[in-house]
Amino acid sequence: MEIWNAYTADGQLTDHTLTRGESIPDGLYHLVVECIIRHRDGSTLFMKRDNTKLSYPDYYEATAGGSALFGEIAEQAILREVREETGIELTADQLRHHTHFVAHDDQCIFHCYWAETDWDKSTIQLQADETSNYIWVPQENLKYFLETELVIPRQKDYVERLFLEQEQGKSENETQYNMR
């Protein structure tokens, strides 16, 4: 059973707890964290969702992440989620806070990060029933990858804002990217 802290929409911690799978009372929210992983060489990690996933099966995820567990703050939760979902061990000083927003329909408060690492790219771990593959997409192929592959739309927007807006005006190299 997964237990979460409950927050108000403005991010204030309450005395309530929430349980995954149970309805969330009106006016309460749970904390969700996501992190885009960037390698020091400029490539971005995408994890392919398992084809048995209910939402976005066989789509690429640009982030590792999930719900913060009871007692965790956002930074603790994202370090744990990245380790569980990819095997990458990040430190808090590698995290760069990108944005946060409230998804009222889902009763979630999202904290979104990105991090740069020099982790061995060949040692990414897949999570059974969660992910089926991964790919490191070089910066010069990122625009093409986002245009031609199934990527979760909201995460695609993050990647574009973070790593492609700086590229506007430059010529794009649309060579094929290499699967692992």
Which residues are covered by each model-predicted region?
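Glycine-rich, flexible loop/turn motifs
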Residues: 3, 9, 14, 20, ...
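Residue-level detector of high-confidence beta-strand sites
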Residues: 16, 47, 98-100
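Conserved Nudix-box catalytic region and its N-terminal flanking loop in Nudix hydrolases
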Residues: 22-32, 40-80, 84
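A short coil-to-beta-strand element that immediately follows conserved catalytic motifs
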Residues: 89-98
